């Protein structure tokens, strides 16, 4: 038993092996430490490079903002949806809506307001229009077609399922606005839809902007949202995705001077056009158009930030003012800063609304550009 408990003496080579093992272990520890230090240094270098790149991008963006290439003012147009009821067939109703969309896009209209001039806002909307609100059928159809045409082609399938109102939308001429881009077209801004794709926490969502690659943005957003993306100037050609950040839909207009389409708003009556303005202080310049107005050539437009031009239907603005329960005015002219006749000496007894939009915006455009640019 004593012999079994006694330590066996080391052989002549075992002590040396033990020393070699310790040296090898110490050497491995030092190598591992060096490797960790090297890895940490590389990580810090990458972080520093990313910070420098972010700082450089911020400086470039700040310099771009200082250039002030944008358009500071907005232009809104309001018209009654009842003009569609004057068309003789579903095809002509659709084509009429397309003419209005084209006219507004040509003159860079930022907002189209479709109002109900016939006082039908109190009626219940039934059938396929349930849930839209208290609006007339023509108003809703006009608004839907206007929205459809404004949407870039590569996003329409996601936002516009098959609908009876859009049955003949294939007949319409495209707007071909700056935000309706081809796949390989280069641009600082693009419209896109947030795709339903899993992302790691703290990393941004992916957006389909109609290009060969998706765009990775700086925020996590709900799938299905339509967003305006500003693409980074430096894009690595070998990356699986492009990179950019989500910006306001107004940025292309205010920072780059690009026309970026229009928004569509439904108003239950003429007074709601003014009362439900999307701007904090409302419209600071309102213009009514009528054959009973003063000559547009003598009109002096004041400085403005948000202009609104209102058109009447077959019976003129008087019909909308009379049918509105919120208005108690003898003449619609008192509702506007300017009440103008944009086509004096007309050779036809009537000017259709789609014609009046083209005529009026062409007549007002020079004054609007000057007065809008003067606003500080």
Swiss-Prot record:
Coiled coil feature spans: none
Note: Depletion with RNAi causes a significant accumulation of cells in later prometaphase with misaligned chromosomes.
Subunit structure: Interacts with INCA1.
Record's keyword terms, sorted: Cell cycle, Cell division, Centromere, Chromosome, Cytoplasm, Cytoskeleton, Kinetochore, Methyltransferase, Mitosis, RNA-binding, rRNA processing, S-adenosyl-L-methionine, Transferase
Disordered as annotated region, ranges: 1-33, 49-71
Protein name: 28S rRNA (uridine-N(3))-methyltransferase
Biological process annotations from GO: cell division; maintenance of centrosome location; miRNA processing; post-transcriptional regulation of gene expression; rRNA base methylation
SUPFAM superfamilies assigned: alpha/beta knot, Nucleic acid-binding proteins
Gene: SPOUT1
Positions that bind S-adenosyl-L-homocysteine: 289, 292, 312, 341-342
Matches recorded under Pfam families: Methyltrn_RNA_3
Superkingdom field: Eukaryota
Protein's organism: Homo sapiens (Human)
Basic and acidic residues: bias regions: 15-33
Residues reported in the UniProt entry to bind S-adenosyl-L-methionine: 292, 312, 341-342
GO molecular function, one term: RNA binding
Uppermost EC category: transferase
Family: Belongs to the class IV-like SAM-binding methyltransferase superfamily.
Record function comment: S-adenosyl-L-methionine-dependent methyltransferase that specifically methylates the N3 position of a uridine in 28S rRNA. Required for association of the centrosomes with the poles of the bipolar mitotic spindle during metaphase. Also involved in chromosome alignment. May promote centrosome maturation probably by recruiting A-kinase anchor protein AKAP9 to centrosomes in early mitosis. Binds specifically to miRNA MIR145 hairpin, regulates MIR145 expression at a postranscriptional level.
EC number(s) per entry: 2.1.1.-
Catalytic reactions on record: uridine in 28S rRNA + S-adenosyl-L-methionine = N(3)-methyluridine in 28S rRNA + S-adenosyl-L-homocysteine + H(+)
Cellular component terms (Gene Ontology): cytoplasm; kinetochore; mitotic spindle; spindle pole centrosome
Compartment annotation: Cytoplasm, Cytoskeleton, Spindle; Chromosome, Centromere, Kinetochore; Cytoplasm, Cytoskeleton, Microtubule organizing center, Centrosome
